[in-house]
């Protein structure tokens, strides 16, 4: 059996900016600011790296950021679920993804997994919104 690994954002799904829309208010609630969230490049980073990058850019120490992460994640995940509800059908699988996943999951030669910087629950929320959460047997996440 071969493992086939997929990223979430921009590979499997387009969530209409729900992640950024959720992170900003959650960061304000926990840290009182977001840093340069509108210009910061989220791609290729784990969720913890994104928060550290945003706040260290405005003078926070890594240790100060890390101290707030346990409080941030539940708020972020709640806001993410709300943001995904608001974007509705715009939280969708990219073209051809569902057909590809249907073929791969039906073929016993393959096991589909996730490799993503998203928190595990954040990835699952995004995939549920896109209608493909049940296609993945395992994964590595930004929360690991």
Regions found by a protein language model. Give the residues of each.
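Active-site cradle of extracellular carbohydrate-active enzymes
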Residues: 117-118, 144
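Active-site neighborhood of HAD-like aspartate-dependent phosphohydrolases
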Residues: 1-43, 49-52, 56-59
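Short helix-capping segments at alpha-helix termini
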Residues: 29-34, 59-62, 107, 131-135
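Short, acidic loop-to-helix structural element flanking the phosphoryl-transfer center
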Residues: 5, 82-114, 120
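Phosphate- and divalent-cation-binding pockets in alpha/beta enzyme and binding domains
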Residues: 22, 122-125
